[in-house]
Amino acid sequence: MKQAAARVVIAGIAVASLSACTIGDVSAPEHPTAASSPQPTLPESTPEKEPPVIEASDIHEALEAIAADNPGTGIAVAGADTVAAAGITDPQSAWSTAKVPLAIAAERAGVADPETVSRAITFSDNAAADSLWEALGGGEHAAQATQEIIGTATVPATPPRPGFSAFGQTQWPVAEQAEFVAALGCQQGTDPVLAAMGQPDPAQQYGLGTLEGSVMKGGWGPAEDGAYEARQMGLVSLGGHTVAVAIYAKAESGDYGEAQQMLTRLVKQLAAAEVEWPDAGCQQGAV
């Protein structure tokens, strides 16, 4: 069953037509429209020169070098029995990446509508994610169900910051995210979510989204100081291996577009590094 779902992801599923995404996990209207909930767009800028190729002997050395060459970023990769992380590795707001465990929790509870999952995961629709949260009972019930999927980070029952979702403010380190993604294919209720993660959204073709066949979810929003953060987690192909990756960026300028560019630059170096990458432990949803 899971391998069949993987083939669907690999082949590429037709993108759903409904798309309504807001910048960050700001509370959205119950029935959002594309006009009321604008999608993030890649910034218009002059092409930057290619970043230097990182030379390293192993994944730890590679990640340390990549993080050092990209200040303000964090990166982690995980395999069946290993995890490596560098740069900003302390817990940061999960933003919309938390919609993945939320959707899985809804799938397990039997309250996940396929279209709602597609909107919440592929297009990062906040109203759709809120629907899943409420379908789980909201508050403590939804937080506990979602936290059981994550297994590590604590999911708030109420929004710690006004105007933002409770689940989006889950503090989730990149290392724990990478480990979470590495095990996704072995978990119950993940097939529809992995399929939605594998559908390309033109508005999110940066960072991991620039790698062909990536199965990923992104999140973004303003930190408490107002500077925008952007992060992604997913399964990607590196050196012939299916690798679980989690990345984070916060631009010194505070600009969301710059944070996007930082993730893209980091991913270019990640893809070019010639090291032995660890295979994800569970690859049913792999590229």
Located regions from the model:
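Structured C-terminal helix/loop/strand segments within mature extracytoplasmic catalytic/sensor domains
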Residues: 2-10, 15, 22-64, 112, ...
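Short glycine/serine- and small hydrophobic-enriched flexible loop segments
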Residues: 104-111, 134, 179-183, 268, ...
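Active-site-proximal beta-strand/loop segments in catalytic clefts of secreted hydrolases
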Residues: 78-80, 106, 120-125, 132-136, ...
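Active-site SXXK
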Residues: 91-111, 120, 245
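A conserved catalytic-loop motif detector
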Residues: 167-225
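Second-shell loop/turn segments in exported
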Residues: 46-53, 86-92, 116-119, 127-136, ...
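A short, well-structured edge-of-sheet supersecondary motif
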Residues: 52-88
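Mid-domain, small-residue-enriched loop/turn segments at the edges of structured enzyme/sensor domains
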Residues: 130-188
